[in-house]
Amino acid sequence: MEKTIEIDGKKVRFKTNGATPLRYKAQFGTDYFKEILKLAPLQKLQGDNQSITADDMQHLDFEVFYNISWIMAKTADPTIPEPLEWLEQFDVFPMAVVIPELQDLMLSSFQTTKKN
């Protein structure tokens, strides 16, 4: 699955595939699926109920989101630099915009395909 979104005036491609969880573990040393589960409070951003409480925010580890974003960008474009250098190219990395855009990609690793 692939998606292109605009961040800080730049078109950025994000992609997931079967190797995404293994690439994540190789880069960051932690399990991709466990890390995604840490972002569960973000599900509140889907649909009409788009509010996250201060308590939800306290339990979020935004480093996980930055890491997952980088893995998806690296999967789409193997030439991008290491995570910190990649993030430094953006003057802003608006979480409120990026998170909802990438949720489907994150969740695609958990979904099955429907058989006809």
Q: What does each model-identified segment do?
A:
Residues M72:
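Active-site helix/loop of acyl-thioester processing domains in fatty-acid/polyketide metabolism
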Residues G18-L37:
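Short, surface-exposed, low-complexity cationic segments
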Residues F14-T16:
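Short capping micro-motif at the N-terminus of alpha-helices
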Residues M1-K11, D31-M57, E63, T75-N116:
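Charged interaction scaffolds used for protein-protein
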